[in-house]
């Protein structure tokens, strides 16, 4: 009936059985951006935000979120991640967040990378909202994936 792997022949949702698949090296990178006022960005860069170390807290939040993805996203397998990295890059009025997740396993880590990036962005908002309530989170997307049946993919 459907080509979606999370639906059975009758259209009902189910968790995909990955038991028979071989374990392979897998990696996913995801990212997004949070735009803000110049003042808020300067405070974050200087470590002067009222709530403390914004980027350090956002990094830990992103890593924790990646580890909890199987609990947050229905039908997503709980995974034993080998590594998660959350990196930040400053722009003129924004911070770009890139999260990378990897493992050797039977299913991909795209959702873990996306969850890490989104929660890191949300944490930046939470930690800096006293400085700028009008911050805008945008462009959350998968940037790259490696491994598995579909091979290597890079966003255009």
UniProtKB/Swiss-Prot annotation:
CDD domains listed in its UniProt record: MoaC_PE (cd01420)
UniProt xrefs under Pfam families: MoaC
GO molecular function, one term: cyclic pyranopterin monophosphate synthase activity
First-level EC class: lyase
Statement: the UniProt record of this protein carries the keyword Lyase: yes
Pathway info: Cofactor biosynthesis; molybdopterin biosynthesis
Catalytic residues identified in the record: 126
UniProt-listed Gene3D superfamilies: Molybdopterin cofactor biosynthesis C (MoaC) domain
One GO BP annotation of this record: Mo-molybdopterin cofactor biosynthetic process
UniProt: substrate binding residues: 75-77, 111-112
Listed EC numbers: 4.6.1.17
Entry keywords, A to Z: Lyase, Molybdenum cofactor biosynthesis
InterPro entries linked: MoaC, MoaC_bact/euk, MoaC_sf, MoCo_biosynth_MoaA/MoaC, Mopterin_CF_biosynth-C_dom
Catalytic function, reaction form: (8S)-3',8-cyclo-7,8-dihydroguanosine 5'-triphosphate = cyclic pyranopterin phosphate + diphosphate
Family, similarity comment: Belongs to the MoaC family.
Quaternary structure note: Homohexamer; trimer of dimers.
NCBIfam families: moaC (TIGR00581), PRK09364.1 (NF006870)
Job of this protein: Catalyzes the conversion of (8S)-3',8-cyclo-7,8-dihydroguanosine 5'-triphosphate to cyclic pyranopterin monophosphate (cPMP).
PANTHER family: CYCLIC PYRANOPTERIN MONOPHOSPHATE SYNTHASE, MOLYBDOPTERIN COFACTOR SYNTHESIS PROTEIN A
Protein name in the entry: Cyclic pyranopterin monophosphate synthase
Organism: Erythrobacter litoralis (strain HTCC2594)
């Amino acid at each position: 009936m459907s080509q979606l792997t999370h639906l059975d022949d009758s259209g009902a949702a189910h968790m995909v059985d990955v038991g028979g698949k071989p374990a392979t090296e897998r990696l996913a990178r995801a990212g997004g951006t949070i735009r803000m006022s110049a003042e808020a960005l300067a405070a974050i860069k200087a470590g002067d935000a009222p709530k403390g170390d914004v980027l350090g807290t956002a990094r830990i939040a992103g890593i924790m979120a990646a580890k909890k993805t199987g609990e947050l996203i229905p039908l997503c397998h709980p995974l034993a991640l080998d590594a998660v990295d959350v990196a930040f890059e400053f722009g003129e009025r924004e911070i770009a967040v890139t999260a990378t997740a990897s493992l050797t396993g039977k299913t991909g880590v795209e959702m873990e990378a996306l969850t890490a990036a989104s929660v890191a962005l949300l944490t930046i908002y939470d930690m800096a909202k006293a400085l700028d309530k009008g911050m805008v989170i945008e462009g959350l997307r998968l940037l790259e994936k490696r491994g598995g049946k579909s091979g290597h993919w890079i966003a255009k």
